[in-house]
C-alpha cells in the first residue's frame, strides 16, 4: 500500500518529507483486568482496585479474561484486520517500580490481530488509507506519583494489569494533519464498537509517535519515538516540532540519534528521555504461565455478525438515503452520540425523505454551533431530538419560515416547551395567503420608486425588496411567495 502524500516541510536545503508511524495504547472497556478479577473503575482510592495477581504475590497465576479477548477481536474486525486464531502471550522483561512482576505480559511474534487499515478524511474532501501492522493485548503498568512528597515517590497499582490494546500503524502517515485525523478516526471506531472509551484526559487512549524525515523519495531516516501524548492537538504539535528539530540537525551536518523523547506542550518542543530500546533489549519469551490463546472461526464470525454499524458504513448510508454531502455526513458520524441524536431526529419525522437533509443542516449548524459556543456536549443539549424534529417538520410543512425557526429554536433552548404549541400560542405561523403577501409587496414597491428603477437594471437588488417585505411582515411571509411576486411585479 502506498502512503498518501502529505504536506512537505521547508528546510534550508529544500523540501523534506515526514514519515510517521503510531502506536496507540487503548484501555479495553471491561469490568475486570486482563489477568485478574480486580475492578478497572477509574478514580478509586490509590491501591483500592488491586488483586494479589496484579502485584505479583508468590504463587499467584494469571487467568485470561475472555471479555478482553472478545473486545480485541471486535476491534480487529472494526479495523478490517486479519484475526489470528492462535496467538501467544510473551514476557517483556524490564524493571521499573510500576511493574511489580519485573516483566510485562504482552504479545510479540504472535499477536491476536494482524494487518488491517483505516481510511481517514482530510481537508478538501481528500482521504488517506493508513495501514495497521498489528494489534496485541498487554497489561497496563501502575502509575508513579512524584508530587506527593519531596523525598519519596509513591505507586498506585489500580491501573496495573488493566487490559491494553496496542494498535501499531504502518509508517504511512505523512504529516501532522494525517496524524491527527488517524487518531481521531481510530478513537471514533473504538467508541462505536464500545471497546475503549477513548478518554485521553483519563489516559484511556495514549499515543506514541515515531517520526523521521527524508528527502522526498529518499531512504527512510532515523526515527525518534515521542512517548505518551494524551491530546490530539498535542500530537500535531509534537510531529511538527520533532520534524523541524530533525531537519535542522541534518541540515547543520549532524545525525539523528534513535531515542525516546517526550513533548513539552508549554515550550512546543520535544526533549530527550533515553536511548530507544530494541526488541532484543526486552528479552521476549513465551509466558510459561499462560497457554497459547486459541479460538475457532465460529467465535470470530459470531462477533462479526453482532458488530454495530461503524462510521464509514453509517456515512455511506446517510449520503445514499438522505442526500447528505460527504462533509455533512462525516460531521454527523464523527461521534457515536452525534449520529445517534441525528437518527433520533429522523425517527421523529414523518417525511424523512423530504426533511433528512434539512434536519442535518439544523443539527450541524444550529445545534452543534450553539453547543460548541457554550462548551456543552450533545448529552447536555437543552433541545431534545424530538423538539428539534418538530422544528424541522414545521419548516418542511411550510408552517414557519427559516427565520422564525431560528427564533423558535432560541425559545426552546432557553425556556423549553413543545415547538408546535409555541408556534400557535405566540402567533409565529408563516403567512402563506398570497393576497396578504401581495398587499405588503405592493406597499414596498410603491414606497420605493427609485429602487424599482434600479432593480430593473440590476436584478440582484431584488434581494433588498425581499428583505423589506420580510421585515414588514415580521419574518412571517413565505420567502418563496415573496420572491415570486417581486420578480413578477418588478419584471425581472
Curated annotation (Swiss-Prot):
Record key words, sorted: ATP-binding, Ligase, Nucleotide-binding, Protein biosynthesis
InterPro entries, per database record: Asn/Gln-tRNA_amidoTrfase_suB/E, Asn/Gln-tRNA_Trfase_suB/E_cat, Asn/Gln_amidotransferase, Asn/Gln_tRNA_amidoTrase-B-like, GatB, GatB_C_1, GatB_Yqey_C_2, Gln-tRNA_amidoTrfase_suB_CS
Source domain of life: Bacteria
Bridged cysteine pairs (disulfide): none
EC number: 6.3.5.-
Cross-referenced Gene3D superfamilies: 1.10.10.410, GatB domain, N-terminal subdomain
NCBIfam families in the cross-refs: gatB, PRK05477.1-2, PRK05477.1-4, PRK05477.1-5
Assigned protein family: Belongs to the GatB/GatE family. GatB subfamily.
Descriptive protein name: Aspartyl/glutamyl-tRNA(Asn/Gln) amidotransferase subunit B
Lineage of the organism: Bacteria, Pseudomonadati, Pseudomonadota, Alphaproteobacteria, Hyphomicrobiales
Amino acid at each position: 500500500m502506498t502512503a498518501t502524500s502529505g504536506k512537505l516541510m521547508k528546510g534550508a536545503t529544500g523540501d523534506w518529507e515526514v514519515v510517521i508511524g503510531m502506536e496507540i495504547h487503548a484501555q479495553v472497556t471491561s469490568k475486570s483486568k486482563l489477568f485478574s478479577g480486580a475492578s478497572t473503575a477509574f478514580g478509586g482510592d490509590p491501591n483500592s482496585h488491586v488483586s494479589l495477581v496484579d502485584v505479583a504475590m508468590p504463587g499467584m497465576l494469571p487467568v485470561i479474561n475472555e471479555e478482553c479477548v472478545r473486545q480485541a477481536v471486535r476491534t480487529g474486525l472494526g479495523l478490517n484486520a486479519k484475526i489470528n486464531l492462535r496467538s501467544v502471550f510473551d514476557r517483556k522483561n524490564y524493571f521499573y517500580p510500576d511493574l511489580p512482576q519485573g516483566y510485562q505480559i504482552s504479545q510479540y511474534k504472535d499477536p491476536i490481530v494482524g494487518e488491517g487499515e483505516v481510511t481517514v478524511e482530510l481537508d478538501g474532501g481528500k482521504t488517506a488509507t493508513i495501514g495497521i501492522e498489528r494489534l496485541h493485548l498487554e497489561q497496563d503498568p501502575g502509575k508513579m506519583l512524584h508530587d506527593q512528597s519531596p523525598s519519596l515517590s509513591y505507586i498506585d497499582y489500580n491501573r496495573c494489569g488493566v487490559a491494553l490494546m496496542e494498535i501499531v500503524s504502518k509508517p504511512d502517515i505523512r504529516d501532522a494533519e494525517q496524524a491527527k485525523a488517524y487518531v481521531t478516526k481510530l478513537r471514533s471506531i473504538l467508541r462505536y464498537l464500545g471497546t475503549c472509551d477513548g478518554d485521553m484526559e483519563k489516559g484511556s487512549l495514549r499515543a506514541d509517535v515515531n517520526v523521521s524525515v527524508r528527502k522526498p523519495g529518499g531512504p527512510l531516516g532515523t526515527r525518534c519515538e515521542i512517548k505518551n501524548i494524551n491530546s490530539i492537538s498535542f500530537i500535531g504539535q509534537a510531529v511538527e516540532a520533532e520534524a523541524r528539530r530533525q531537519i535542522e540537525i541534518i541540515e547543520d551536518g549532524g545525525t539523528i540519534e534513535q531515542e525516546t523523547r517526550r513533548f513539552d506542550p508549554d515550550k512546543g518542543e520535544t526533549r530527550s528521555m533515553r536511548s530507544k530500546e530494541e526488541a532484543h533489549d526486552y528479552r521476549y519469551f513465551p509466558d510459561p504461565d499462560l497457554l497459547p490463546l486459541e479460538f475457532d472461526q465460529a467465535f470470530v464470525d459470531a462477533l462479526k455478525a453482532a458488530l454495530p454499524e461503524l462510521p464509514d458504513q453509517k456515512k455511506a448510508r446517510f449520503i445514499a438515503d438522505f442526500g447528505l454531502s460527504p462533509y455533512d455526513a462525516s460531521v454527523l458520524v464523527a461521534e457515536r452520540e452525534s449520529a445517534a441524536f441525528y437518527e433520533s431526529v429522523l425517527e421523529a419525522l414523518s417525511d424523512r425523505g423530504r426533511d433528512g437533509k434539512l434536519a442535518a443542516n439544523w443539527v450541524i449548524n444550529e445545534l452543534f454551533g450553539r453547543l460548541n459556543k457554550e462548551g456543552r456536549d450533545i448529552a447536555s443539549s437543552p433541545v431534545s431530538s424530538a423538539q428539534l424534529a418538530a422544528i424541522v417538520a414545521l419548516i418542511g410543512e411550510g408552517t414557519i419560515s427559516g427565520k422564525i425557526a431560528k427564533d423558535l429554536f432560541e425559545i426552546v433552548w432557553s425556556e423549553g416547551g413543545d415547538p408546535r404549541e409555541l408556534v400557535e400560542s405566540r402567533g409565529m405561523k408563516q403567512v402563506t395567503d398570497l393576497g396578504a403577501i401581495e398587499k405588503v409587496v405592493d406597499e414596498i414597491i410603491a414606497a420605493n420608486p427609485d429602487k424599482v428603477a434600479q432593480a430593473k437594471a440590476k436584478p440582484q437588488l431584488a434581494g433588498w425588496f425581499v428583505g423589506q417585505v420580510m421585515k414588514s411582515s415580521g419574518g412571517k411571509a413565505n420567502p418563496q411567495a415573496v420572491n415570486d411576486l417581486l420578480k413578477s411585479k418588478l419584471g425581472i
